[in-house]
Amino acid sequence: MFFAASKIFWLFVQPISLLLAGLLVSILAIALGWWRLGLAFSSITTVLLALAGFTTLGNIMLLPLEDRFTRPALPARIDGIVVLGGYMEGEINASRGGHEVNGAADRIIETMRLARHYPEARIVVSGGEGTFFEDSVPDAISTRALFRDFSLTGDRLFFEDRSRNTYENAVYSREMVKPQPGETWLLVTSAFHMPRSVGCFRQAGFPVIAWPVDYSTRPDRHFTIDLQNPLGNLTQVTIAMREWLGLAAYWFSGKIGEVLPAPGGVSVVGG
């Protein structure tokens, strides 16, 4: 229920949907002779589009998320690594085969690097079919084939392909590997996604060390006009809005213990 509701909710509140709604309302209002209302909505829509596409607003919105957890020094030893899906183009892989990756490919690249550095560590790839409207190959399934092509095999590999969201990533990963007290596990995911991910793993009773990757912000970039990359700017705003709304929804539904999880939190004993 939560999965379906979250997908439908996001369909209507993502920035492009809100901008389209504002445009349609303004057209309808003008057609009905409500000129002031139409002008107001068209003006608001134009301003929001300009802010999202032609300023560094997205960078500002993402920065607190990406800076929340910093990557520590490499531990001397670890017991395992959990990498969260979201780096594969599941719909394309379903229709064309292969294992096409997207802009979050840093997640799996860093995991493979860590796997070589820690040859005894268990590796959990957590990523099921998170799409709602189209057929998709789960990231865990595609990654199994990718690992095989790179001769990365063995009984230390675990592929969790049931999860559809971040909370299920945590719950099903914990069920699969049953981490013991005192073990050291790294959690690999995009930096902007790390606060919500760590919060979910804590709530599931799976203590992890955050290992953020896939950074997209510059700490030295303040709010300013940016005319060079409107599509990239709009994409950053969309990602940031989705993540902040996700944090609020997860906190409200009890899937994380605080609105913006921070370093030093405590895992729930027993999940």
Residue ranges and their predicted role:
Residues 30-38:
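Membrane-interface helix-boundary motifs at transmembrane edges
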Residues 1-30:
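Membrane-embedded alpha-helical segments of integral membrane proteins
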Residues 1-9, 57, 61-65, 241-248, ...:
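Hydrophobic alpha-helical segments of integral membrane proteins
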Residues 223-228, 235-271:
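Extracytoplasmic/luminal low-complexity segments enriched in Pro/Gly and acidic/polar residues
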Residues 35, 64-68, 254-262:
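Transmembrane helix-loop junctions in multipass membrane proteins, especially transporters and channels
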